[in-house]
Regions:
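Short, well-ordered alpha-helix to beta-strand connector turns
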Residues: 6-8, 83, 130
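A charged, aromatic-enriched C-terminal amphipathic alpha-helix characteristic of glycosyltransferases
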Residues: 196-246
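Nucleotide-sugar-dependent
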Residues: 118-165, 171-180, 184
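Conserved catalytic-core segment of nucleotide-activated headgroup transferases in glycan assembly
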Residues: 39-128
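Well-ordered beta-strand positions
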Residues: 8-9, 132, 169, 191
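A short, active-site helix/loop in glycosyltransferases that binds the activated sugar's phosphate group
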Residues: 1-32, 43-44, 95, 99
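Carbohydrate-associated surface elements
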Residues: 16, 37-38
């Protein structure tokens, strides 16, 4: 907090974080910039999309590119009953979540699939075969009050960029009525599926026309999730901060 208070320029990952900090740092007149700190290089955002698995087996295939944050084994079982598959990536994730995986397999049968870590250069080709990808699932309880916000409310999960690269609709629980940064962005760009429960999610995922539109929206906006897209604006911001502090030398 002291660092932000004394900084000549401030960078925030999103407007919600900015508003949260400004409750405490007071001085709102210094230069600021909005930029997510986890944006990958644009070179990973290739055009090599794969055919959808669902086109061949007529099931729904979802992916978690990291830990299944907020998903319980029983949720995976309920997904399976709606013929929705979960593909879980990451060797470390599978090791750390081994007990969770055992429980999920007991109730999901053939609907839980484990995959090794996917390198950034393979994001598009690997993940684009799925119908949608999971963000972080949680129930917000801030009721629109900044002081009640938790990190889940204010955070942009890093996997948003991974899913955007592959053009995948993003799955997140509907926390309408609360301040949730990722949900605001999803609604603004039309890049996700916000659901109240698993049956609601299943119904939305099986609406192929609507899901295709969301997928197209993600592909349209995916460059916004690269660092390259924002590099010039960041450089301009640095120049703005320097100019605001420039001391004229005596002649």
């Amino acid at each position: 907090m002291e660092l932000y208070y004394n900084a000549d320029g401030r960078i925030y990952i999103n407007p919600e974080i900015k508003n949260w900090y400004e409750q405490f740092i007071g001085d709102k007149n210094r230069p600021f910039h909005i930029l997510d700190g986890d944006l990958p290089l644009g070179k990973w955002f290739s055009e090599k999309r794969s055919p959808l698995l669902s086109d061949s087996d007529h099931a729904i295939h979802t992916v978690s590119s990291g830990r299944p944050y907020g998903l319980e084994p029983d949720d995976v079982g309920e997904l399976a009953r709606h013929n929705i598959h979960l593909h879980l990536y990451g060797d470390y994730t599978q090791s750390f979540w081994s007990h969770w995986i055992r429980e999920a397999r007991e109730v999901a049968k053939d609907h839980l699939h484990l995959h090794s870590y996917c390198k950034p250069e393979d994001w598009v080709q690997e993940y684009s075969q799925y119908d949608a990808g999971w963000l972080h699932l949680f129930r917000s309880d801030n009721y629109g009050e900044l002081l009640r916000c938790k990190w889940d409310d204010l955070n942009y999960p890093a996997r948003m960029c991974t899913l955007a690269a592959a053009g995948l609709p993003m799955l997140q629980r509907n926390n309408n009525g609360h301040l949730v940064a990722a949900e605001r962005l999803i609604r603004k760009l039309g890049i996700g599926v916000l659901f109240n429960n698993i049956p609601d999610l299943a119904e939305q995922l099986k609406d192929q026309h609507a899901l295709k539109q969301v997928r197209n929206n993600v592909w349209t906006h995916r460059e916004q999730f690269t660092f390259d897209h924002h590099a010039q604006e960041l450089a301009d911001f640095f120049q703005q901060v320097i100019a605001s502090k420039k001391i004229l030398q005596p002649a």
